[in-house]
Amino acid sequence: MEVRPKEGWNHADFVYCEDTEFAPGKPTVNADEEVGGPQICRVCGDKATGYHFNVMTCEGCKGFFRRAMKRNARLRCPFRKGACEITRKTRRQCQACRLRKCLESGMKKEMIMSDAAVEERRALIKRKKRERIGTQPPGVQGLTEEQRMMIRELMDAQMKTFDTTFSHFKNFRLPGVLSSGCEMPESLQAPSREEAAKWNQVRKDLWSVKVSVQLRGEDGSVWNYKPPADNGGKEIFSLLPHMADMSTYMFKGIINFAKVISYFRDLPIEDQISLLKGATFELCQLRFNTVFNAETGTWECGRLSYCLEDPAGGFQQLLLEPMLKFHYMLKKLQLHEEEYVLMQAISLFSPDRPGVVQHRVVDQLQEQYAITLKSYIECNRPQPAHRFLFLKIMAMLTELRSINAQHTQRLLRIQDIHPFATPLMQELFGITGS
C-alpha cells in the first residue's frame, strides 16, 4: 500500500469493518476466565476476548493484525511521527502506530494461520457442529429448554384430558324420532310475526348442513340416524339434545386441560374464568379436528361417527359453511400433535377476551406459545413446502375466532326459541334463564 500525503490520506482504504471481522475459531483462553475478571486489549484498551497471536486483545485488533501481516503493507504515521496514542476511539486514525503497538505488545506473525489451515479448521468446526446436532433427539434442535418444557406440559395435559376414543362418553341422549322429543315448539305452531322471524333465522342456521349419526354397540350392533326430509321444521330439533351432551362432555375436557397448565393456574380465578368462557368452543373445535376424516367427511369419535350428508349443491356447497371449511382446511395442513396443543394454548391465552384483567401477563404467555410453535415448525419441518405453515396456522386461529362469534350468536338464537343448553353450556355462553 502506498503512503499518501497527510492532507489526502484515507484510512478507509486499509480498514474493512475491522470490528466485525472475526478470525475463525475461538481464542485459546477466554478473557473473562482470567484471574481478576474481564481483561482489556493490550493494544487499544477495548474489552479483550482472549489471547490472539500471543497477546490478550479485542476482536478488532486481532482482525487488524491478521490483515496487516497477510498484506505485508508498508505504513507510515501521518501525524506524530510514530508516537500516536492508540485507544478504542483513535485506533482507526493511524494504522502505522496501531501496527507498531501490536508488535510491541508481543503479537507474532508466525502464529497467523494460512488460508488453507483456516479453511480446514472451519470445515472441522462445521463437522463437529453437525455431529453434535445429530446426537440430539429429533424435534429438539433449536428449541430452548423452556420451550421443550412448555410442549411437554401441553402434551401431558392433552393426554390426561382428551379421551380420543370417547370411551367415557356415556349416558347421552340419542336423536329422537319424529313422533317424540322433537316436536316444533308450541310457540311456533301459531307464531307471531316476531316469532316467525326468529324461526326463519334458526331454520337457516341449522338447515345449511345435515349430519347423520352412527353408533356401534359393544355387541357389534349398529344404530343409524339419518336426518329426515323437511317435515314442517320439527326435524331440525332432533339432534340438539345429543349435540348438547357431546358438547358438554368436550367442554369438561377443555376445562380440565387448562387446569393442568401451570401458567393458567397462576392466573387469578377471574381471568381463568374469562379465558375459558372465551376459548372453550375454539379448543373444542381444534380437538374435533384431530378426529375428522376429510376424505369421508366424518368425525370418528370412538363408537360414534358423525357424517356430513351431501347437500343438493354437492361437496362445494358444504364449503360455503365456515365451520366445515375450517375443518377441511385445517386437516389439510396435516399437523403434528404438538402443533395442535400449541394452537390450543395460543387460543386459550388470548388477552382480549371479555373480562380479562391481567392483559399484559396473558399477552406475554400467548406470545411465548406462538414463538414456541414457530420454533417447533422450523426445527421439525425444514422443507420449503412448510415455510409458510406458521402463518397459515395463525390465520386459521383468526378464522376460528370469527367462527366462535358466529356460533355463539346461533346458539343464543336457538336457545331463545327452543331451550336445549346444559347448565355448563349456559355458564360458558352467558345464557340466562331457560
Swiss-Prot record:
Primary residence: nucleus
Listed Gene3D superfamilies: Erythroid Transcription Factor GATA-1, subunit A, Retinoid X Receptor
Residue span, NR LBD domain: 146-433
Species assigned in the record: Macaca mulatta
GO cellular component: chromatin; nucleoplasm; nucleus
Bipartite nuclear localization signal, short sequence motif: residues: 66-92
Protein name: Nuclear receptor subfamily 1 group I member 2
Keyword Cytoplasm set for record: no
Protein role: Nuclear receptor that binds and is activated by a variety of endogenous and xenobiotic compounds. Transcription factor that activates the transcription of multiple genes involved in the metabolism and secretion of potentially harmful xenobiotics, endogenous compounds and drugs. Response to specific ligands is species-specific, due to differences in the ligand-binding domain. Activated by naturally occurring steroids, such as pregnenolone and progesterone. Binds to a response element in the promoters of the CYP3A4 and ABCB1/MDR1 genes.
